């Protein structure tokens, strides 16, 4: 188990290129199984979860060509040799379950063990099952395997929750189903839009992605294409927070403006704001490749304020930040915002509605000197500013891990973060990225 050693009180400032969105890349990798032709994805992040997802794809016989330097991945599923995911791979990454929809659509069957991933709370799969059944698949649910089989037909499906992965799985299953499928109460996240754009580029007919009603006209077959993974606005929010708590000026490249409209209100509560502008630049076209001229043409600029101050509600009521399904504030940024609150003058209530175990990491922040009261598994009250002090902490999951990194960057002294591999699942080489921005951070093998 590796660790990160961070010596705090250094300004994080400069220019950082935001990676592609992990939550878009993973289902897009799974979608490549829907055709026998090559599918090329660009702007794919070089992170551990992507590597694991590609290993799962290879287990089906998919040929994978990856160029990490250009963030390009090409997948060719000419022949799918099995409909079963190896249990050892499924235990490592929860999104292995996203292969269920494509396999069911292409082969008419799928068998996989219960998925793994971060232990941030109970995440039900019932919505996936109900969607597959509605499309005509018959289920055989055992203790160690989840199996579905059948010929899929379009229908109307009302999801009992706006689950992102359920929406993705049912969407991928329905593109090769006969007839029309209507998915009500669909998730609206930007990565759903990225997936739909890929499917349409492959020859599918998907309308309404980004709204709570998605319609699909089933196709007989899909073909290969090239598609781009959208920007990781969660990574962007993490780096903005790191700059804010250390007093640095930051420019983020390779961003897209749409997701930040959802984030800006919550960040403004803490006195953090930014501007996004077009930065047209010349594209370098590699031989035989098509490059979108505007692919990286937006930049985000953050200029720090002298002091961070909480913006209270009318009547000086304590503000509350709650997560929810898009376009509510994303759960993946709540841990990061809690660290921002420790460095902001004022008090704020955080309400984690989606995962009952996500907020337990605040014990590590309290160990570092944060003034936090945990009301229950879903709510904490943070009062700032706090003078954080380094120590030894353990990263329990991706988002809590990066939150601890940010806390260490503004803490006095040295902080050792154990289980650094959990952070690698969602962030590209944080020691190099933050190091390039002025942080004193190094990785050590434990």
What does each of the following model-derived ranges do?
Residues 1-446:
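Short, structured segments at the rim of ligand-binding sites
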């Amino acid at each position: 188990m590796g660790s990160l050693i961070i010596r705090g009180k250094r300004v994080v400032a400069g220019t950082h290129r935001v990676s592609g969105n992990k939550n878009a890349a993973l289902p897009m990798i799974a979608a490549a199984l829907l055709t026998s032709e090559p599918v090329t994805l660009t702007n794919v992040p070089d992170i551990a979860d992507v590597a694991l997802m590609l290993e799962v794809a290879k287990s089906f016989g998919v040929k994978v060509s990856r160029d990490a330097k250009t963030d390009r991945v090409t997948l060719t599923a000419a022949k799918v040799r099995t409909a079963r995911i190896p249990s050892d791979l499924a235990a490592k990454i929860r999104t292995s379950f996203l292969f269920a929809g494509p396999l069911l659509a292409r082969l008419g069957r799928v068998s996989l063990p219960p998925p793994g991933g971060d232990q941030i709370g109970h995440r039900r799969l019932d919505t996936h099952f109900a969607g597959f059944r509605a499309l005509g698949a018959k289920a055989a649910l055992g203790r160690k395997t989840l199996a579905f089989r059948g010929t899929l037909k379009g229908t109307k499906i009302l999801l009992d929750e706006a689950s992102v992965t359920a929406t993705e799985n049912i969407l991928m299953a329905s593109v090769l189903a006969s007839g029309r499928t209507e998915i009500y109460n669909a998730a609206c996240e930007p990565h759903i839009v990225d997936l739909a754009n890929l499917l349409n580029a492959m020859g599918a007919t998907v309308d309404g992605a980004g709204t709570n009603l998605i319609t699909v006209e089933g196709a007989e077959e899909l073909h290969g294409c090239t598609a781009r993974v959208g920007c990781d606005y969660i990574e962007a929010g993490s780096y903005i927070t790191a700059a804010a708590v250390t007093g640095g000026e930051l420019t983020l490249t390779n961003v897209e403006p749409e997701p930040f409209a959802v984030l800006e209100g919550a960040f403004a509560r803490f006195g953090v704001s930014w501007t996004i502008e077009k930065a047209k630049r010349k594209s370098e076209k590699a031989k035989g490749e098509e490059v979108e001229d505007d692919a990286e043409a937006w930049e985000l600029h953050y200029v720090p304020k002298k002091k961070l101050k909480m913006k209270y509600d009318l009547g000086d009521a304590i503000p509350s930040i709650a997560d929810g399904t898009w376009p509510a504030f994303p759960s993946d940024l709540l841990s990061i915002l809690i660290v921002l609150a420790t460095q902001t003058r004022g008090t704020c209530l955080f309400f984690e509605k989606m995962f009952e175990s996500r907020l337990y990491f605040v014990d590590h922040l309290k160990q570092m000197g944060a003034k936090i009261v945990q009301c229950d598994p879903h709510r904490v009250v943070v009062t700032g500013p706090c003078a954080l002090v380094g120590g030894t902490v353990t990263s329990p999951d991706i988002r809590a891990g990066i939150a601890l990194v940010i806390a260490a960057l503004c803490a006095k002294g040295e902080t050792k973060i154990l289980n650094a591999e959990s952070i690698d699942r969602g962030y590209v080489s944080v020691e190099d990225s933050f190091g390039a921005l002025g942080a004193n951070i190094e990785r050590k093998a434990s």
